[in-house]
Amino acid sequence: MSLLCVGVKKAKFDGAQEKFNTYVTLKVQNVKSTTIAVRGSQPSWEQDFMFEINRLDLGLTVEVWNKGLIWDTMVGTVWIPLRTIRQSNEEGPGEWLTLDSQAIMADSEICGTKDPTFHRILLDAHFELPLDIPEEEARYWAKKLEQLNAMRDQDEYSFQDQQDKPLPVPSSQCCNWNYFGWGEQNDDPDSAVDDRDSDYRSETSNSIPPPYYTTSQPNASVHQYSVRPPPLGSRESYSDSMHSYEEFSEPRALSPTGSSRYASSGELSQGSSQLSEDFDPDEHSLQGSELDDERDRDSYHSCHSSVSYHKDSPRWDQDDEDLEDLEDLEDEELPEEEEELEEEGEEELEEEDLEEEEEVPDDLASYTQQEDTTVAEPKEFKRISFPTAAPQKDDKVSAVPTEAPEVAKGIPKAATPEEKAAAERAQEAEPPKSEESFRSREEEEGQEGQDAMSRAKANWLRAFNKVRMQLQEARGEGDMSKSLWFKGGPGGGLIIIDSMPDIRKRKPIPLVSDLAMSLVQSRKAGITSALASSTLNNEELKNHVYKKTLQALIYPISCTTPHNFEVWTATTPTYCYECEGLLWGIARQGMRCTECGVKCHEKCQDLLNADCLQRAAEKSSKHGAEDRTQNIIMVLKDRMKIRERNKPEIFELIQEIFAVTKSAHTQQMKAVKQSVLDGTSKWSAKISITVVCAQGLQAKDKTGSSDPYVTVQVGKTKKRTKTIYGNLNPVWEENFHFECHNSSDRIKVRVWDEDDDIKSRVKQRFKRESDDFLGQTIIEVRTLSGEMDVWYNLDKRTDKSAVSGAIRLHISVEIKGEEKVAPYHVQYTCLHENLFHFVTDVQNNGVVKIPDAKGDDAWKVYYDETAQEIVDEFAMRYGVESIYQAMTHFACLSSKYMCPGVPAVMSTLLANINAYYAHTTASTNVSASDRFAASNFGKERFVKLLDQLHNSLRIDLSMYRNNFPASSPERLQDLKSTVDLLTSITFFRMKVQELQSPPRASQVVKDCVKACLNSTYEYIFNNCHELYGREYQTDPAKKGEVPPEEQGPSIKNLDFWSKLITLIVSIIEEDKNSYTPCLNQFPQELNVGKISAEVMWSLFAQDMKYAMEEHDKHRLCKSADYMNLHFKVKWLYNEYVAELPTFKDRVPEYPAWFEPFVIQWLDENEEVSRDFLHGALERDKKDGFQQTSEHALFSCSVVDVFSQLNQSFEIIKKLECPDPQIVGHYMRRFAKTISNVLLQYADIVSKDFASYCSKEKEKVPCILMNNTQQLRVQLEKMFEAMGGKELDAEASGTLKELQVKLNNVLDELSHVFATSFQPHIEECVRQMGDILSQVKGTGNVPASACSSVAQDADNVLQPIMDLLDSNLTLFAKICEKTVLKRVLKELWKLVMNTMEKTIVLPPLTDQTMIGTLLRKHGKGLEKGRVKLPSHSDGTQMIFNAAKELGQLSKLKDHMVREEAKSLTPKQCAVVELALDTIKQYFHAGGVGLKKTFLEKSPDLQSLRYALSLYTQATDLLIKTFVQTQSAQGSGVEDPVGEVSVHVELFTHPGTGEQKVTVKVVAANDLKWQTSGIFRPFIEVNIVGPQLSDKKRKFATKSKNNSWAPKYNESFQFSLSADAGPECYELQVCVKDYCFAREDRTVGLAVLQLRELAQRGSAACWLPLGRRIHMDDTGLTVLRILSQRSNDEVAKEFVKLKSDTRSAEEGGAAPAP
């Protein structure tokens, strides 16, 4: 991707001024940009546009359009090929291009233009160049260019030519060979954006590294801009060089710091503090003076060294000879031993398996930790791998280039597991590109064979794929997870289900904290010392720093003599030494030092900080006052002697730090003292100052702007820049040179606003400063060394000054005698690092000694008193800022960040560093990132340090249980501080670096905690048996060795899971009680205890689910074992997981795992319950069904049965299943168990119940009925306990159905029990009948006779009352209320029915036999009841019985004999009164049956209705019969023939008299057999009220032997005018005429006249039935009428309705 910058400047058009209103459009790669519209023939736009270009074979289309009223017209166009556009980092003056009028098209794309116009446009287009490649790399490319130029015999090209050539497009780094560790020399280890911290990068750079480097340079405040021009060379050659290098690059031996051959570590030039040690030139590195020589060479701005080419790039088809030459050249450069090692490495990689531990050489380990930040996967964690110790937040895998060198220092190195993992992730991120790129490169090699490098790449790919497969297997990605469950184990015996498992929490065991893990960590904690302590081995630098330290400490600034100022009066115009302003006033104008004579304003005296003694000595020596000088020198000598005598420990410590011998130290002390005495008299330096630019200046002009310029003064020499008009962010780029001979001088840089108005001219007359002051910065010369590029904040001069902004200066100082030394900041770094190394590693065995300091500035105290004084005095002497000191100490501590107490110190340090940069003051508006960029420590260096520290902290937090054991309060405090440090790093990235969305510290820690928990779970899972035995096994007998195959999960037992739950609980408890209070910085976002529970449960749930599925297939354990495990899992979930936000509103899965086993247990439980039921009933039977207690009316079998059921239900209930669906399944199954058990109980009781009733023991049947009722009561309670209305619908239905069945059983038992009293009741009622028959009197009873009626009623009731009284009293005592009411109901029915049948409606004639027959037909005595509203089969049954016995005909004779027992009205009154008494008795004052029930009882109503019928007239009874019996002839299923009749109904209009005319037409299909002649005739009867005086019957003539006779005879009946047709009916009867005997009935039919009431007439076929159908009401009317022997109409009616088809005789067959 390249950045194309296009500036549209102006244009010149041929035409009138007013004709044009134009705008410009730019099109490239489907992107279009447009300028504003400008009027005139010479418009000026001055607009810049930027495009991202990834194809250089296209072009930029520029079109100029003229705006119109309706549409726009094109003025002209020009097409610029992208290849022709120059590369530059600066804007050019632009180029005038002629516009053409037409575009040339090819394949629908513009490829040029034609037909020029007279219009022209000024455009400036250039590609941006990459910035800041390391100087070393620049020299390398320059060297390559020279070699290629020599090979091709080409001379230098001009720089302009070079600019005009296109820059090849660099490919994305996501697709280069750094994935596989090749071409690592192309990778810049110091690139901040290309850092390997994937978590950090994934949120800041979208996982795509930028195409160019931004490499840090030594002592750089901002970037080190090159001040030398780049070397001239062929752009073509340069491109080819890049191409070839990419194609044939080979792995190189790495330097000890891990920096590559050509890409410097970012700190190599200018005596860098990052230089680890001197290099040998043969090993492609720099040493000694060669470094200095190289420093003078030209640097070159190169593009990113991993540039690759597309096939359509301009130089793709270059001749191959260049490439071959380069290949030969590079082969020569590769040492032989490296080639051999390459081959060895290939073999090793092919044979290598993924091992548990790998030994890495120290230097390589150092390299790996510094440069390759891929995280070493802890060996004991086999389930998970976390590349940066924290899982990615999204599914994208960051494409992080991973360096994997094959050789270092001649030692072969195989790929470490970390690198394999990184390679795997990279391969997963972009496998297609990598393979395609690899294939394309292989094709380029040709068919002859591959060179060594290509073979190495192929081997790498093979090894990588192999490792990738192994990693997949190791992670269990194959189908191997289920094999876990096929391991054997001891079987468990039957145990009682423990619904409250005792998961022991007696102590939070440090399972993984203090116990040795299965493998040791391969990575040492701490950032590599190569980064933090780069100066330890630089002896030359150390020697120089040693001298400078002595110099700073022998006469420290803190001991300098202050000026002795006094008020002074100037006699001549005098100027302030500090601000150079005139000392105004007549007298006492300023201050003057009595010792050295310096004069200044009163306000400026504090700005003069030079040592008065040294200043006096300098002044005296210059003016020849030797005596005075000698005095001062003596004072200085004395002071240094006193210093040395009073503070000997300081100089001894300095000697020990730099390991200087005693004699050498003594000599050096003398030399240092002499240099101090010499002061500045022999000191001189050349200072070069470049005023680069300024930002954020104050606006002083009325226009809201300023015209700034800068004055620079060193000593008395003052220079100024040019003025930049109207700009608050001016750029000057002006260089000034000074010579300085006084180290106490200061550089005064002041910014002014130039004014050229009258006011300023007047001001100039009176003041030396006519311009407005914009700010200043004062720089001590003695603090300068080497080269510096620094932003300085502009300071005020007085309190009234309005100042803002900052100025950037590039300062180069060459001090005489110190031309080649490092800058003072680098020297300070050397001092600090060596001091830290000495105090920590030498004196304290690697443990950081933390000083005891308090107060606001405690963070600035890094060592104890002596060492702290050394660094402070050095910093003060040489101008090292306190923030630089802090950053340096932070870098030192980062190498020991795992030492006790260090994280807290680092956290405080970084917090103060953050505050320094992020908290801007009112005096400056420079952003935090700009302030940080101006840091002398080096922006990139510090960012990289933080990135690597961040990465390492994440790794260690991902093993917090190891690194910060809960048993150590000190380490827990370190853990807390470590998180604080992470938070400070995040704050730094957000506020100082100003990154958009750095990873939140809380999220990072959360990911680390999860990673640690993952590995902890894996560890306890794999070592469950051993850990449990060690911590919890108290029984020595159980501590025996268990075979390895039985230590894991088994399908034969469940012990493993119980132990695992115990261990999980201990882990969660440890996190909850130890780590949660410690990591409390993010209360809303991070709770370690909750995360622990969540992760542990998630992993446990996954394994448990698979295990239970496996167990479900085999079922080798007892159901009780599964239930016990279920309770433990339930407890674990409820105790730790249920309230977690993730699971709170979710139905957990664990009940589903155990559902089949719970159902199995319920199945088994039903069998147990049934066996228990039989046992309980047998015991109860033996005991005689005794009451369980005095107050309980039921026996113990009910209690036993429900105790067992309740226990079973309690177990189900205690499962507390949170899944409603599964609860429903359990309830359904348990409801079936309840139903089966209780119904079995009821069946057993029902079978034997009758036998208990037959004995003269009323108590046992009552107890059994009470038991049944108690079943119903307990069932209702259980229904409520199971959920009541909320219970599953199916289970609820089962229990309700069971309740109905038990109710029916109770009804049946009550009926059976009551029926056992029937013989006694019948006997009593017969006695009542006999007493009633003796009651005399007819007609209605007068009021005066009421008392006699009551007396008669009492007499009549006497027998039944005696029976009821004796029994009901007993029942009330031994029956439950519900049972008692049921028994009373049955007895009530029995009494009522018996009275009705025996007294009110006695049976016809042969009562006993008819009663017996009725019972035989299954209807019992109750069939005689009157049921007014309903129809039943009672009538038919009676007639059937009568027919079978031939007794119905006796009904016809009934009235002839005097056997009928017809009740008189008085007797009816007595019966009525007796009924009321019986009713009151059964009500029993509310204890018995309810009055409403008794009143509405159908039995009572039937009896009363029968009594009421006794008092009704015959006509009324006949009318009732006709109106109620509407189905006498209907429903004839088996007709015996049919009769055709025509009926007409006529009403006289005057009298209202009604007549019915009946025409008998014919009969048909008569079914009759007779031995004689068949003579059918038809008889028609009219039935109804008030017909006693009218003719009621007609008959036709008979027909001989005709089964379908025709009659056509008409008859007329007269009806009463008082009753309507609905009260009458016609009964048609077909008979066989017999001469000598009674006619035989063939069939009967009834036609009710109500059907003709509307129509008036009807012709119809009437089917003939065998008898008349009637209900109980009809039968009752018939029986009452049958007792009226003196009533002809009644007798005739009874005979008519009781007639049935006669018996047939065998004879002739019916006619067809």
UniProtKB/Swiss-Prot annotation:
Swiss-Prot/TrEMBL cofactor(s): Ca(2+)
Domain C2: start-end pairs: 1-97, 668-792, 1535-1662
Record domain MHD1: where: 1102-1245
Keyword Transcription: no
Residue ranges, compositional bias (Basic and acidic residues): 193-202, 416-442
Compositionally skewed regions (Acidic residues) per UniProt: 318-362
Main subcellular localisation: cytoplasm
PROSITE patterns: C2 (PS50004), MHD1 (PS51258), MHD2 (PS51259), ZF_DAG_PE_1 (PS00479), ZF_DAG_PE_2 (PS50081)
Listed name of the protein: Protein unc-13 homolog A
